[in-house]
């Protein structure tokens, strides 16, 4: 074999090896994905719990079990604000939080706490979820170490109490109503003469049972799933504020996933937009 022939043969062997390595990498890009486990913190509402269960089912189905979801329902990892903070520091991968609770971390979410900003669910979906201004606003959540994933249906807030039905704002005067530590909520209730009392959600049932507060306000799904009807006589369909659930994810966790895994997570989230049983 001439030296020229040897050189050509050597080049061809090298090219074949390089091509082979390239084909192996390309061909195995998604077949050799690292298995991923996601810690998912959820709230007490039936609608969110069902959505969380469906998300787990879809993700594990789409990934053929390469992605598993550990679902912690009923605020097992803390209330929704605590869970969102857990997502910020990386202890929790995904969490569901009401926009009202999340607004303490990202103030633009306060927009959803404006009384009677939305009059029906369709307005919420068209403007509050999918509108151009809303989409721009939601991008900003990345500034506080969270990745906005989706909005889930929660519902309009309604008023319950033990004294009388509420027909006009004046009927709330003097009533001690449990609220979140939310400046917009506090100012709104004070403006109509009520006595807003910030209190942890976990303490609310006992507080109403013992008469520490006269009433509370929440979406129907939360009122029902927490059996507030056992300690409250009246419910008034005031529908004064729409409070969506916001699903957030730790951005570093999301970025650590392969493109295919990210597509699976996004697809499952998109299947659950506007999910509700209330």
What is each model feature region?
Residues 5-123, 141-276:
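N-terminal secretory/targeting leader peptides
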Residues 1-3:
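N-terminal secretory signal peptides that target proteins for export/translocation
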Residues 124-132:
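A gly/proline- and charged-residue-enriched helix-loop-helix capping module
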């Amino acid at each position: 074999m001439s030296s020229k022939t040897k050189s050509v043969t050597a080049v061809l062997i090298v090219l074949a090896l390089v091509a082979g390595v390239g084909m192996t990498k390309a061909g195995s890009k998604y077949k050799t994905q690292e298995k991923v486990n996601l810690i998912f913190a959820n709230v007490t509402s039936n609608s969110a719990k069902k959505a969380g269960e469906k998300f787990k089912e879809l993700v594990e189905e789409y990934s053929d079990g390469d992605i598993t979801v550990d679902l912690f329902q009923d605020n097992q990892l803390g209330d929704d604000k605590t869970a969102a903070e857990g997502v910020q520091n990386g202890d929790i991968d995904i969490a569901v939080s009401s926009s009202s609770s999340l607004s303490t971390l990202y103030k633009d979410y306060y927009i959803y706490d404006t009384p009677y900003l939305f009059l029906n669910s369709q307005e919420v979906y068209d403007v509050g979820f999918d509108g151009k201004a809303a989409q721009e606003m939601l991008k900003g959540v990345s500034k506080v170490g969270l990745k906005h994933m989706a909005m889930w249906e929660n519902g309009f807030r309604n008023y319950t109490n033990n004294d009388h039905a509420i027909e006009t704002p004046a009927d709330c005067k003097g009533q001690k109503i449990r609220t979140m530590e939310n400046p917009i909520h506090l100012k709104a209730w004070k403006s109509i003469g009520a006595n807003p009392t910030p209190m942890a959600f976990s303490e609310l049932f006992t507080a109403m049972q013992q008469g520490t507060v006269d009433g509370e306000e929440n979406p129907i799904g939360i009122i029902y799933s927490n059996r507030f009807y056992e300690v409250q006589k009246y419910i008034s369909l005031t529908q004064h504020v729409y409070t969506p659930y916001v699903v957030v994810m730790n951005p570093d966790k999301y970025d650590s996933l392969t493109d295919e895994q990210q597509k699976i997570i996004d697809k499952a989230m998109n299947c659950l937009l506007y999910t509700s049983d209330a």
